[in-house]
From Swiss-Prot:
Keywords noted in UniProt: Lyase, Magnesium, Metal-binding
Superkingdom assignment: Eukaryota
Organism from which the protein derives: Melampsora lini (Rust fungus)
Family stated for the protein in its record: Belongs to the FPP/GGPP synthase family.
Pfam families: polyprenyl_synt
EC id: 4.2.3.-
Database matches in CDD domains: Trans_IPPS
Cysteines engaged in disulfide bonds, as pairs: none
Reactions accelerated catalytically: (2E)-geranyl diphosphate + H2O = linalool + diphosphate; (2E,6E)-farnesyl diphosphate + H2O = (6E)-nerolidol + diphosphate
Full protein name: IDS-like terpene synthase 3
Length: 324
């Protein structure tokens, strides 16, 4: 007897979704191997809860929301940047293919989105608090920032530092703001302090720190040597270098080539270090922003957990970068 002889009996079977199906679907996400508890957005979220005092069960749900969204953004970033390595391993789309990795990234985002309803019982005023708008607004901001950055890269248009900071505020800032806005909505404190000026600085700090770290040999084993040159990406130090000596087209010419060889990338790095002093400028900016963040933290009464996170920001050149 064919299954088509009584097709209506097949519908319950068709609707079934097994654990083995789920495992297959999320394999690129699982392969990424992220311990979300140790990822920066989760660590910052837990530190900021010092001011919001959200109960642990609700905090756990928030972490279950931001973890997959952050991971999905990394999966998509690697595709859009045509990266080869992450954490020293081949990127997910080189193993599972672009199509499956995109599908997985989209799926885990929707899966995280479904968890938002689990936060409703913790709301003081569920009828006036729209948690879904928080998620939608920040995911939209993330895509806006990413889209502008891709536009700069693909059109070989170097932004100003101010434009770059606005892009970071959207792309990187959204990953930090999303969980903190959820904390704010669920806060057990009647009048929590305004932590968002500090939070926005933290997002900028860690993005610029990542930009300068990507030029360090220590980063090679994780992502490859100076991959921003290979990707044609306008990172913070690269932007400064292009703008600092507009009469010299060396760096723009190298970015146009998107070189894979180390010799060309070392030449670009040497130009940035010696000619335009862009590494020194970047560390100077990091030092100034870190000081501003620490001052803002003091105004909020201090937070030992967040202070420890800020100490991870390196504000002076490493010997390895200096040797370059």
């Amino acid at each position: 007897m064919s299954i088509y002889d009584d097709i209506f009996k097949q519908f319950p079977m068709i609707d079934e979704w097994s654990d083995s199906d789920e495992k297959i679907l999320v394999e690129p996400y699982t392969y990424l191997g992220i311990n979300t508890a140790k990822e920066l957005p989760s660590m910052v979220t837990k530190a900021f809860n010092h001011w919001y005092q959200v109960p642990q069960p609700a905090l756990d749900i928030i972490l279950q929301i931001i973890g997959p969204i952050h991971a999905a953004s990394l999966l998509l970033d690697d595709i859009q940047d045509d990266s080869d390595l992450r954490g020293g391993n081949p990127v997910a789309h080189k193993v599972y293919g672009v199509a499956q990795t995109i599908n997985t990234a989209t799926y885990v985002c929707f899966d995280a989105y479904h968890k938002v309803s689990q936060l409703t019982p913790f709301l003081k005023s569920p009828e006036t608090t729209d948690l879904w708008s928080i998620i939608n607004d920040e995911i939209a901001a993330l895509h806006r920032g990413q889209g502008i950055e891709l536009y700069w890269r693909d059109s070989l248009m170097c932004p100003t530092e101010e434009e770059y900071l606005r892009m970071i505020h959207n792309k990187t800032g959204a990953i930090f703001r999303l969980p903190i806005k959820l904390l704010q909505a669920l806060s057990s404190v009647d009048s929590p302090p305004d932590c968002f000026p500090l939070l926005n600085i933290v997002g900028i700090l860690f993005q610029i720190q990542n930009d300068i770290s990507s030029l360090s040999p220590d980063f090679t084993k994780d992502k490859g040597f100076c991959e921003d040159f290979s990707e044609g990406k306008f990172s913070f130090p690269i932007i400064h270098s292009v703008k600092a000596d507009s009469s010299n087209s060396l760096l723009m010419d190298i970015l146009r080539l998107r070189p894979k060889d180390e010799a060309t990338k070392r030449k670009a790095l040497r130009f940035m270090k010696d000619q335009t002093k862009s590494l020194d400028h970047t560390f100077h900016v990091l030092c100034k922003l870190k000081k501003t963040a620490q001052e803002e933290l003091e105004k909020l009464g201090g937070n030992s957990e967040l202070s420890s996170i800020l100490e991870r920001i390196q504000v002076s050149p490493t010997p390895e970068i200096e040797d370059r």
